[in-house]
Amino acid sequence: MIKAQKLVDSYPISFLLSLAFCLRIYNIQSPILGVHSWRQADTAAMARNFYENGYNFFYPQIDWGGNLAGYCQTEFPIYSFSVAILYKFFGVHESIGRLLSIIFSLIAIYFFYKLCLEITCDKKLAFWSSFFYTIIPTNIYYSRTFQPESLVLMSAISGTYFFYKWIKNDHKKYLFISSLLICLACLVKVVPAFYLFLPFTYLVWQKFKYKMFSNLNLYLYTAIIIIPTFAWYFHSYQVANEYRLSFGFSAEKLGWNFQGLGIMFEQIVYFIAVRHLLVVGFIIMIFGIFCRRENKEEIFFDMLFISNILYIIVFANIHSSHEYYQLFFLITASVYMGKVFTRNRYSTKIINVIIVVFLLTGSLFYSLEYMTKENPNNSELFELAQIIKQTVPKNSLIIATTGNDPTILYLSDRKGWIPSPNAINQTYLLDRFKDGAKYLVGGYNFVQAYQSSMEEKDKKKIREVVSRSSNSILNSENFFLIKL
């Protein structure tokens, strides 16, 4: 035990990165299933379409465009494009996308440790903060999924580190590197601009005071971030107008849903306190917020925390829908958790008990909530995808009743439409048949990957449609597949 502790003290980053890699590499070969498979399926589909249809970076393609080319308004597709390039050398394997996410997450952990150490000058705090950031179950999961979250976090954290280095050393190379990294983060997900503005402004004010308004380097820094970001999203908006396909960058997703305000914020608290921090971690974080600050530089993390809270409140609608929008919140949460273990006089025994409870709770939660749902042997959706692969010709367009969830299209390597079951009627089927649809497919026991059963009225209606068809290929207790 003593030797192990000395090893951790001597090589903290090596220990953290090794631990992070081991936690994330498990089940890397899993197909696109489970929690938020719909988001992963879109990202994976873009990568596969880049690989199969030519590397047209400015026009990413999805699978649910029906008889259209599938050009879609998306975030900056550098992640999918990078995976597609790797496909050229290694073939199409989901594990490549997952491995790329893991690599980005390891870089993020490295710079998170360096940032904590740079700001606090406390090696022990930097380690404990990074340790909790490494083992939080949701952070483990989303840093090995087939989506660009780990790229955004890596870019934002490393960009923040280099910005802080510039503040302290005044070397322009740090500012330039930071501008490129923050620009990349904003291109992929524009939200870093919201939660980094306040802490960056705090750092600049501490250094320059009113002279910040006449600092040309800061204007150039801002321009490097804003101009490419605006250019991409303007282009993406034009794609949406021309091809009528979008990931849903709309005003309806912003702000508040006043009719369900209580439920909305209750869901956000549930995401943060229960799913992210497992209650135990949330309590530790609350204690950490009130721990002393050793220097004024540490206020940076308080500014980042406040910025995150404001961002969550202002954009509460999207935060109540998807848990991965709070991933950046885990940075400050981890710092506060780390402070509890370094700035309070708790006995080693108490610390060990808390860590064991957190690890056991996290392991159980991660296994039951995430890993079991990635098991194809437990998935009717995956089973149906294999039936489609074997039954439906490769280039035939299908209608899948998965309610805007493209997972079935990706897993079956088919293209088509993904309406909700309640949209299915003879008029809809006739219109899609005229558009080139050849098959209607679906499952009676699931709609979206996150909706485990179809409503009885929709199930009854679809059974009637299937029973009237003279070209029914499959109509079992679980699945239906008919030729139109």
Label every PLM stretch briefly.
Residues A20-F21, S129-T134, I182, C186, ...:
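Short helix- or helix-capping micro-motifs
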Residues I25-Q29, D42-Y71, I78:
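Extracytosolic helix-loop segments that constitute the early lumenal/periplasmic catalytic or substrate-binding loops
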Residues D42-N53, L184, Y195-I299, N308-E323, ...:
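Transmembrane-lumen/periplasm boundary regions of multi-pass, lipid-linked membrane glycan transferases
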Residues I96-T120, S158-F162:
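Transmembrane-helix motifs of polytopic, lipid-linked glycan transferases
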Residues L117-K124, G159-L175, A185, F341:
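Membrane-interface transmembrane helices that cradle and orient dolichyl/undecaprenyl
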Residues Y141-L151:
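Short acidic/glycine- and proline-prone juxtamembrane loop motifs at membrane-interface regions
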Residues P192, V340-P376:
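Transmembrane alpha-helical segments
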Residues L196-F197, N378, K389-F433, A437-Q448:
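Short periplasmic/luminal acceptor-recognition loop of GT-C membrane glycosyltransferases, typified by
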